Amino acid sequence: MLFPTPLISGRLERRYKRFLADVTLDDGRFITASVPNTGSMLGLTAPGSRVWLSFSDAPHRKYAHTLQIVEADNTLVGVNTGLPNRIAEEAILKGLIPDLDGYATLKREQKYGRNSRIDLLLDDGPRPRAYVEVKNVHFIRTPGLAEFPDTVTARGAKHLDELVDVVAAGHRGIMLFITQRADCSRFGISGDLDPFYARAFERAIASGVEAWAVRCHITENGIDATELVPIEDMRRIE
């Protein structure tokens, strides 16, 4: 996935009100940017961090700049939670996930469950449909181990329960974690940060929901899904 225009670099001053960040650009300008991320961005908001932003002069936008990448632990980390669905779709279409290869059709944002929309729906006539729920991952606190979630996510637990219902109806329920950073070799659920989600994940796997984790390579030009990483056994569940 390529960024449509070159990114602009700067230094993060602060993130606040969840969706805003103050940034000093490399040319000295001080700007306020939108932050397309509803999570805590734990470990990614230190003042002075190198950041990269996209720019749009569309008249309907209140803020022309959008935060896309933060440098943390000498690694570029994608923070735009609007991108993982596109990254996941590209990963599936290029055969990165063998168990999801070969479906005839791929549809986005299809209604299902309890007033929800599935991120990706794969269909192929006689084969069971595959309902793919995509989650963005950028949290690392142990070297090499990417974790989800970085804060409590009741919505995430609801999605797991809906995937269980999908499996019970004879379809495939897929949990696909897109890790927007390259410095991970494995993935795990952070049960200490959200025990309820961790237990929901455990129940979902026991009920037949499938889970995959994908690592990405991040540059100032774009984000590319590169390979699967193993998912560790449940850990730190209280």
Swiss-Prot record:
<dbReference type="InterPro" id="IPR040452">
    <property type="entry name" value="SfsA_C"/>
</dbReference>
<dbReference type="Pfam" id="PF03749">
    <property type="entry name" value="SfsA"/>
</dbReference>
<protein>
    <recommendedName>
        <fullName>Sugar fermentation stimulation protein homolog</fullName>
    </recommendedName>
</protein>
<dbReference type="InterPro" id="IPR005224">
    <property type="entry name" value="SfsA"/>
</dbReference>
<dbReference type="InterPro" id="IPR041465">
    <property type="entry name" value="SfsA_N"/>
</dbReference>
<dbReference type="GO" id="GO:0003677">
    <property type="term" value="F:DNA binding"/>
</dbReference>
<comment type="similarity">
    <text>Belongs to the SfsA family.</text>
</comment>
<dbReference type="Pfam" id="PF17746">
    <property type="entry name" value="SfsA_N"/>
</dbReference>
